C-alpha cells in the first residue's frame, strides 16, 4: 500500500514536471519565434555596411578630422593675428594723438 502511494506521488510529480516542461518549452518557442521575427525586421530596416565600405568611411572620418583640425589651427592663427592687429592699431592711435598734440 505504501508502495502504491509512493508510486501515485511519483506519477503526480512526473505529470506536474511534464506539464511545467511543456509550458516552458512552449513559452521558449514563442519567444524564440518573436525574437527571430524582430531580428528579421531589424535586418530589413538596417542594412549593414561591408568591410570595405566601413574602412572607407573610417578613412574619410580621419580625413575630415584632420581637415577640421587644420581649420581650427587657422582660426586660432587668425584670432592671434587679430589681437596683434588690434594692439598695433591702438599703438598707432596713441602715436597719432601724440603727433597731433605736438603740432
UniProtKB/Swiss-Prot annotation:
Coiled-coil zones: 51-102
Major place of residence: other
One Pfam family recorded for the sequence: BLI1
Signal peptide: none
UniProt keywords, alphabetically: Coiled coil, Endosome, Transport
Entry GO terms, CC: endosome
Intracellular or extracellular location(s): Endosome
Subunit structure: Component of the biogenesis of lysosome-related organelles complex-1 (BLOC-1).
Family: Belongs to the BLI1 family.
Protein task: Component of the biogenesis of lysosome-related organelles complex-1 (BLOC-1) involved in endosomal cargo sorting.
Protein name per Swiss-Prot or TrEMBL: Biogenesis of lysosome-related organelles complex 1 subunit BLI1
Organism field: Candida glabrata (strain ATCC 2001 / BCRC 20586 / JCM 3761 / NBRC 0622 / NRRL Y-65 / CBS 138)
Organism lineage string: Eukaryota, Fungi, Dikarya, Ascomycota, Saccharomycotina
